[in-house]
Amino acid sequence: MSTDQPAVGSIFDLYKIGAGPSSSHSIGTERAARRFLARQPTPPASVRVTLFGSLAATGRGHLTDQGIRRALDGIPVEIVWDTDAGNLKHPNTIRFDALGVGGRATNSWTVYSIGGGNLRDDSGPVGDDEPARYSHRTVTELLALCEAQGLSFWQLVEKTERAPWPRLETIWEAMEASVRRGLDSRENFLPGPLKLARKARTTLLRGRDLASPQRDLALLAAFALAVSEENAAGGTIVTAPSCGAAGVLPGMLYYYHTVKGLPRRDILEALATAGLFGSVIRANASISGAEVGCQGEVGSACSMAAAAGAQLLGGTLRQIEYAAEIGMEHHLGLTCDPIEGYVQIPCIERNMTACLRAAECAVFALLTDGRHLVSFDDVIDVMYRTGADLQSAYRETARGGLAELWRRRMSGQSKAGAATAAPAEHHSYCD
């Protein structure tokens, strides 16, 4: 397991409000650029930014360069895309060089965008990350603590975090707003060369006319799609635990709040519990697709949403843990292979299916007494080891899987000419 943190950190390290489409490639890199500029005693004549590994491989589709230029506030920027992943301490590595008038480097900084918008350099965590607050590192230990003290998971969060409820209110309001914007959007297509059609609004409108349980599935799908499409369009979302997986948890919570009518306080408590499970994953493994594949992003989001759903259904501590375990276990090995580097295919529909799976995990866990053979912590350990074993082509480099399939298809089309191009519906909906 990862040993970067001595214990589980604050849930507010996990939930960050920012612009998509990627927490590591967009939010993290923009934060790094702002921090680098703030470190300079005087504004440099120009800045050279070298993006390594995954940041170079998929950064254009993730709008990495745009965020960096925005953060450097008009200073001339040279961006170098170095896709060589050899000997990197982290696949999302950035080097900033402040340049004088003659082009000579006056100051340099190497930093790593480790997922969820968080940063680390060779001295440790960077920025406004809150210190580790929880006394234990695993859910097994936290569960035992809650049982001994008669606490629920959300009460442990309340007891441990600094003024959590107003902050969770802000996070939930941002999540709600992202769902509503996605549902209300009249844009037919998402930005980028794929011309991928938005589906959230039509899914909502068609789903309302169905009878349950199909209606419930359609609404869950619409809510998750809405956030994911907003993220893909560069809209403001909440990392949960990342931008690429930002639709799963809000989709679940929005459903229980607006369709099932659960009060806002219940939603905030579920958000607290989900954040605790996500923080355990971050402390013991990774939430970065570039490091462990999409199992660390959508798999983690499904696990968090399953825990939240089980709590909202009235589950016990052990049933909540079981739901979270199922959510992650059945995403093990999930690759990160975005077509053209855009957080669209397979990312958007993957958020939708993970939201549906999370709802199923929560329901099933409550049909049991919560006892099971493989613990949540065991699965997180396996997830991290599996991610380390994944070939780099399947860890957000757009060199394998669906990305490679698409590249070969487009290459064949360019050679054969427009007459042999794939049908338009394949171009828009291939997943």
Each language-model region and where it sits:
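Conserved phosphate/anionic-ligand binding catalytic regions in large, soluble enzymes, centered on
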Residues: 15-33, 233-252, 294-302
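C-terminal regulatory domains involved in ligand/effector binding and gene-expression control
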Residues: 74-209, 219
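Short alpha-helical scaffolding segments that buttress acidic/His motifs in well-ordered protein cores
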Residues: 14, 18, 220-228, 270-278, ...
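Alpha-helical support elements that line or immediately flank enzyme active sites
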Residues: 26-39, 250-261, 306-314
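Non-transmembrane, aqueous-exposed alpha-helical and coiled segments at domain scale
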Residues: 2-7, 12-16, 30-55, 61, ...
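A structural-propensity feature for long, helix-poor, extended segments
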Residues: 46-82, 269-313, 317-323, 329-361
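Functionally critical mobile loop/hinge segments
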Residues: 309-431
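Accessory "access/gating" subregions that flank catalytic or transport cores
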Residues: 166, 176-289, 293, 401-431
